[in-house]
Amino acid sequence: MKYEYGSVLAPIIKSFLDMKHGLGFKYESECKLLRRVDQSALIHELDDVVLTKEFVNDFIKKHANEKDINITSRVTIIRELAKYMNSQGYKAYIVPPLPRGSYHSTFVPYIFTNEELRKIFLAADQFASTPSLDNQYYHQRDKYPIILRILYSTGMRIGEVLQLKIKDINFETNAFMIQEAKNNKDRIIPVHPVTMKYLKDYITKKCIFDNEQYIFTNRNHLPITTRTVYGIFRKILHIACIPHGGKGKGPTVHSFRHTFCVHRLRDWVICGRNISALFPYLCAYMGHADTRCTEYYLRLTAELYPDIVIKSEKYFNEGADRDE
């Protein structure tokens, strides 16, 4: 459903939605919430494009018999809008995120060091070129060095990598098109030229030319399973002499995604990039439902690299003085 916005916030709300849609977010239920923001602005008789602390707190306050999930949804959307407004030069109070869910769980992702990554890629190459005694997997071992390199260089989910077809790859722009992935996010993934060359050589070697053909398949030409990749990855970790901490501790295949996000944020902070402006793009790139997941990685980045804590705190404190 298309909603009409009539308050003083209407132009910035429409601009915000254009930005989100342009990044591949469907933002359907969020449009309804933004309509409520617009209606609240009319009720409060706002005459300027600003989100005050009073306005925001009134918008997110809990009503009688209301479920927590509804409050969470309002907090999320008003935070997203406030961050966008700040990035566009408007004053907007950013309410602190709610302490709930996986973002505050005891789980700590495994983040690879640069040396561990070097060992893993060398071990993967060795695994691909060395036949096992029972010849298990040998006829298809050459796919795993490429899969692992794609995982780290793009931050994609393993399920997304295994669903890649020829039609999803653009060798001219060095990019993947991910459609209908988790959270219903369509997005374009830039790929490093070196990684793309590995992939192109593999595709040529395997004579994969049909647009509907999967890239990484088993002997039945079906996508290999995540379980298979996880099993092979444990073998590669063993070759690399990197211990596995056991169930729930890793490292796992998904650790490449965690590492990509943390390393990207680390590099941005070190280079002095505007984290506030870049955050929505990283969130869209990762396919996160909203910025809370990505914010968790920023906190983790600060914990792993204490020397950049001061720089990263600038992002968290942003908007604290913009509520008047």
Residue ranges of model-derived segments:
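Conserved catalytic core of the tyrosine transesterase superfamily
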Residues: 1-324
